[in-house]
């Protein structure tokens, strides 16, 4: 049977270290901190990954990752991690979150009233929203461009050298699709790349927008159309991918996205937090959203 979702070889990169067992999968990559310290980590595209199965299965997959020789590890377990999982002693456990909305099995996908008005206004003013799948690399080129631009604005690395070939491979897969929003002037101002997982979840994996007067409404229209496309393809849950940015998280919440816990396990030498305080802080900053019940 062909591997789909995050278990697919389409995700494999030059430094891929993913663990694949018959009952489970954990996406991993190998890198270096400051070009020196070896790092085993969950790739940025798989923070809301595909760890699944019962407790015994998940323990077996994680045990294999834990035993790998890297002194520094950052493992993101995703929203389907079993509640009974516990990190090894000396590891740091961090609670983060994504947001999800259920999709109806039939009938229309309804957006909250304010979001629906914004999407309709974008189209009424000449905007066009298109869903493309298969070998439509033009749509995915917009996903790449706007994803990188959005991360650059936030001061985050876009990993362009690895992102470009990755999106080219994903564009050819039947379990992915891209959505673009084009304004009345013919400019693509918002786009997203989406991944359908075997569990029935559709993940907003890549995306971004231009800074313009209509980019906000364009993004709303793009996500609304993505939710409808996911429903047509058999998805029962739409996952916004999670964001630690409070503004972005609020944007997802206004779509009706409900917070779902995701756990991160971090292992590092005892001196790491003093040598690399900013990196340690970024890795271990917890989500407060679940505490607030937002």
Language model: regions and residue ranges:
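A conserved beta-strand-loop-helix scaffold within acyl/acetyltransferase catalytic domains
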Residues: 1-36, 79-101, 106-214
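Short, high-confidence coil segments that cap the C-terminus of an alpha-helix
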Residues: 15-17, 68-72, 176, 232-235
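Active-site/acyl-donor-binding loops of N-acyltransferases
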Residues: 33-36, 83-108, 232-294
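Conserved acyl-donor/pantetheine-binding loop and adjacent beta-alpha core of acyl/acetyltransferases
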Residues: 34-44
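A gly/proline- and charged-residue-enriched helix-loop-helix capping module
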Residues: 44-84
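Glycine-rich loops and low-complexity Gly/Arg-rich segments
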Residues: 53-54, 99-101, 124-125, 155-158, ...
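Short phosphate-engaging motifs
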Residues: 57, 139, 247-248
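Aromatic (often tryptophan-rich) hydrophobic motifs at membrane interfaces
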Residues: 61-64, 165-167, 173-277
